[in-house]
């Protein structure tokens, strides 16, 4: 949902939009909670409170102040990610299709012939890093830019088996117009940028597990971050290949040679970062015009020095000349070298050309060896061709996508590789490598071992759920890693499947109860965003590919009402019960009935079950930003930090009742996952709370009334307001608590309206209006370790007779308290108090 804050109402009517006017009788937190549970996508928030907006944004719900009508029109028609610290709105708005354009934030694409293959009458527009160049389009009171591009489709095309780009991009645009927006993927780049800038400033050592190409710009300015990936393809790995011949295959209709060069250089750069943790000088020989340097410059201040007879406009220092092996002495330490020398074929016959290429390959290799033979802190990437070669067995082979697969590949070596054992590799084996293997990632660092790192902050986004990881090892890492942000795939199957298919692999599935964490926040993507100064207009949908975000070691752990809080916890319930269910009271009714409380009078205001816990369990697929386990734990230890607002703390027994209701719901729905989750949450409640039951009581609290509107034959009709199992020495403690609650007890609005047979021979009158105070009293006794209440649900009633009587119904009648007392069962009254 998105909240657009206005000082005055607007005349226009918008689809899927609701107006909420700030309620001055409620505090900012209560207003935020009410807004978050509205069911429409757009909320126009009138007479807004800035504090309420802040609460929503911290909860991951985008809430933006609107000053002008064009701001409202822009934000209401599309989704966006909001940096609420810097006041920047990143639109994810594809309405630019109506201008017959596709967009890119990679400059090199604009220098290709891609426009020849677009839809008729369409053009390509460059919009800069995260749409930065579009800021001029929006003259708003907040900074605004459109981060939507078609780079995802362009890159997917490059790696696909499709050659016809026009058909491919048409299909992708149609998909985009007919399916739900993959909002997490679109906002992820904004999030990653913010995340790693924050972590690098807060932690001396940061480890990142499983980065993919979409992160290749994110880490350019963070050489200190240790990357773990799937490992490189080494020269020695070619021993598994059979010999093949030249295949020749076109991968792309438009020229992607620059993309290949960029990937080669970035792969080399990240190898250097992995070894030396600092920025090198980047030397490049050949590969002009290298327009992609402009893209790199948007993210980092890396220095480029280049040699090529053709211009390289974005180089810091360009030598418009050929580079010879004797020029290697000009290259400094703490550098990387990219050698991409290849003479244009022009009209040379094939045999002569082949001979020239092989000579240049040997020359390129010699330049690399010469460069690596002296000095320190050097990594080289060199252009090779398929031919009989001796190569170091530990050198890394690269074959990033290029316009046509022919006979070229690339080799990365460091100083140690260049001196390592060399192996003869036949031309046919290298053709086999070229024909069958595409390097899919610029990150080729070693795989991560699932072991706790003592001094590092570990980030593993979408990297550990794969079933080639041992599931128990993943759980152990999450439990034991002190500082981390780790995601795992949430189990939102209905049959409690331990693993599910995803693309061509399988992922383990997890629930929050799979982890034993006492200082971690377990939330959703949008809940996580709120902790890093971001919010989002479209919450995660239960697609089957959703992830838990587990943050360990965060200083926000105790801030229970600020982050990963209960905002939106009833939203799914509202959507269902106000549109599909038998009554809008269905949730209240079901919760009472499933706990054998059949008095449904006033059930919506006096419910005996925690609605928060119940909704968090049965609708966990729709809102798992609320960290239920943390909420339970911090209340059980009395460590919850509440910033403000009216805050109701549930008695532990209310939580147990909620689990029982959720279990009943799961059985009716045949939802095995919710069934397990409810059982495990109940077990967790019993683990962190020391709940004892007065099932063999020796004291009780009684309430005697001035008026009983029914006939009775018991000596003193009264309401048993709870039973206790205590020693006589604890009686003063009980009395002290009763005195503390005196005012609240006598303020209870107690009513009765019918009689019924509680069981054979027990005739009783119903009592309403006491449950809220009962549970508060329960909490007070619990905190003093006084056993109060039984394991079965407390059903307030007044015993009238121990014989069969006819049921009576009357108008709701108020019962006035005469006095409240504490009495020993089969003993004397030890305390009483009147108003």
Curated annotation (Swiss-Prot):
Residues 246-428 are annotated as: 2'-O-methyltransferase activity. GO terms for cellular component: viral nucleocapsid. It is found in: Virion. Residues 556-692 are annotated as: GTase/RTPase activity. It catalyses: a 5'-end diphospho-ribonucleoside in mRNA + GTP + H(+) = a 5'-end (5'-triphosphoguanosine)-ribonucleoside in mRNA + diphosphate; a 5'-end (5'-triphosphoguanosine)-ribonucleoside in mRNA + S-adenosyl-L-methionine = a 5'-end (N(7)-methyl 5'-triphosphoguanosine)-ribonucleoside in mRNA + S-adenosyl-L-homocysteine; 5'-triphosphoadenylyl-(2'->5')-adenylyl-(2'->5')-adenosine + 2 H2O = 2 AMP + ATP + 2 H(+). Residues 693-835 are annotated as: 2'-5'-phosphodiesterase activity. GO terms for molecular function: GTP binding; hydrolase activity; mRNA 5'-cap (guanine-N7-)-methyltransferase activity; mRNA guanylyltransferase activity; RNA binding. GO terms for biological process: symbiont-mediated suppression of host innate immune response; viral process. InterPro entries: VP3_Rotav. The active site is at residues 718, 720, 797, 799. It holds the Pfam family Rotavirus_VP3. Its EC number is 3.1.4.-, 2.7.7.50, 2.1.1.56. Interacts with VP1. Interacts with VP2. Belongs to the rotavirus VP3 family. Contains a bipartite N7-methyltransferase domain, a 2'-O-methyltransferase domain and a GTase/RTPase domain. The C-terminus contains a phosphodiesterase domain that degrades the 5'-triphosphorylated, 2'-5' linked adenylate oligomers produced by the host cell in response to IFN stimulation. This is Protein VP3. It comes from Rotavirus A (strain RVA/Human/Indonesia/69M/1980/G8P4[10]).
């Amino acid at each position: 949902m998105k909240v657009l804050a206005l000082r005055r109402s607007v005349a226009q009517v918008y689809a899927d939009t609701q107006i909420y006017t700030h309620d001055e009788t409620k505090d900012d937190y209560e207003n935020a909670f009410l807004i978050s549970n509205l069911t429409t996508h757009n909320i126009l928030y009138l007479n807004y409170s800035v504090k309420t907006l802040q609460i929503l944004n911290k909860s991951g719900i985008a809430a933006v102040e609107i000053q002008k009508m064009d701001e409202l029109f822009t934000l209401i028609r599309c989704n966006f990610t909001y940096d609420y610290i810097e006041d920047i709105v990143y639109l994810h708005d594809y309405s630019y299709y109506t201008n017959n354009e596709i967009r890119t934030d990679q400059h090199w694409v604009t220098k290709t012939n891609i426009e020849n293959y677009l839809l008729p009458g369409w053009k390509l527009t460059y919009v800069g890093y995260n749409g930065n160049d579009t800021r001029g389009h929006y003259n708003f009171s907040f900074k605004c830019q459109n981060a939507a591009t078609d780079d995802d489709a362009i890159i997917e095309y490059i790696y696909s088996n499709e050659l016809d780009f026009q058909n491919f991009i048409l299909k992708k645009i149609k998909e985009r117009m007919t399916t739900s927006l993959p909002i997490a993927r679109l906002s992820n780049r904004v999030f990653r940028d913010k995340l790693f800038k924050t972590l690098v400033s807060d932690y001396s050592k940061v480890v990142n597990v499983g980065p993919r190409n979409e992160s290749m710009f994110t880490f350019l300015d963070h050489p200190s971050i240790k990357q773990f990936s799937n490992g490189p393809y080494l020269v020695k790995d070619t021993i598994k290949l059979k010999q093949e011949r030249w295949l020749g295959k076109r991968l792309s209709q438009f020229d992607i040679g620059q993309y290949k060069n960029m990937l080669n250089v970035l792969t080399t750069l990240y190898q250097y970062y992995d070894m030396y943790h600092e920025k090198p000088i980047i030397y490049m020989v050949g590969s002009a015009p290298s327009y992609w340097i402009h893209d790199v410059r948007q993210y980092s201040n890396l220095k480029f020095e280049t040699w090529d007879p053709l211009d390289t406009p974005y180089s810091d220092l360009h030598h418009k000349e050929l580079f010879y092996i004797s020029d290697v002495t000009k290259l400094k330490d703490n550098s990387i070298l990219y050698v991409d020398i290849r003479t244009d074929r022009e009209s040379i016959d094939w045999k002569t050309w082949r001979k020239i290429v092989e000579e240049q390959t040997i020359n390129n290799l010699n330049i690399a060896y010469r460069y690596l033979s002296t000095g320190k802190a050097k990594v080289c990437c060199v252009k090779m061709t398929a031919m009989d070669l001796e190569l170091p067995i530990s050198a890394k082979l690269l074959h990033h996508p290029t316009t046509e697969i022919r006979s070229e590949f690339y080799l990365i070596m460091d100083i140690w590789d260049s001196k390592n054992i060399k192996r003869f590799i036949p031309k046919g084996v290298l053709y086999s490598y070229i024909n069958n293997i595409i390097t899919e990632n610029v990150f080729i660092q070693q795989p991560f071992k699932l072991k706790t790192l003592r001094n590092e902050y570990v980030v593993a986004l979408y990297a550990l759920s794969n079933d080639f990881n041992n599931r128990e090892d993943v759980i152990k890492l999450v439990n034991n890693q002190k500082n981390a942000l780790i995601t795992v795939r949430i189990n939102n199957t209905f049959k409690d499947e331990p693993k599910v298919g995803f693309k061509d692999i399988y992922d383990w599935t997890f629930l929050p109860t799979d982890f034993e964490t006492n200082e971690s926040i377990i939330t959703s993507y949008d809940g996580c965003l709120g902790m890093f100064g971001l919010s989002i207009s479209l919450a995660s949908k239960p697609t089957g590919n959703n992830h838990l975000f587990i943050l360990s070691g965060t200083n926000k752990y105790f801030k229970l009402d600020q982050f990963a809080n209960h905002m939106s916890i009833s939203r799914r319930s509202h959507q269902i019960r106000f549109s599909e269910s038998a009554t809008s009271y269905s949730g209240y009714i079901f919760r009472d009935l499933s706990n054998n409380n059949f008095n449904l009078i006033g059930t919506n205001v006096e419910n005996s079950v925690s609605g928060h816990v119940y909704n968090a369990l049965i609708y966990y697929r729709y809102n798992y930003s609320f960290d239920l386990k943390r909420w339970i734990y911090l209340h059980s230890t009395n460590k919850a930090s509440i910033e403000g607002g009216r805050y109701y703390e549930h008695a532990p027994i209310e939580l147990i009742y909620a689990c029982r209701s959720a279990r009943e719901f799961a059985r009716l729905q045949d939802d095995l996952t919710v069934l397990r989750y409810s059982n495990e949450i109940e077990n967790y409640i019993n683990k962190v709370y020391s709940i004892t039951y007065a099932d063999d009581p020796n004291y009780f609290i009684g309430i005697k009334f001035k008026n009983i509107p029914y006939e009775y034959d018991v000596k003193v009709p009264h309401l048993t307001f709870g039973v206790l199992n205590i020693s006589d020495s604890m009686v003063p403690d009980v009395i002290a608590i009763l005195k503390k609650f005196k005012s609240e007890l006598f303020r209870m609005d107690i009513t009765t309206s019918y009689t019924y047979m509680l069981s054979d021979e027990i005739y009783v009158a119903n009592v309403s209006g006491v449950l809220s105070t009962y549970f508060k009293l329960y909490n007070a006794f619990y905190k003093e370790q006084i056993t109060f209440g039984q394991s079965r649900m407390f059903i307030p009633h007044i015993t009238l007779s121990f014989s069969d009587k006819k049921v009576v119904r009357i108008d709701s009648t108020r019962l006035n308290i005469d006095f409240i007392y504490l009495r020993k069962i089969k003993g004397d009254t030890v305390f009483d108090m009147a108003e």
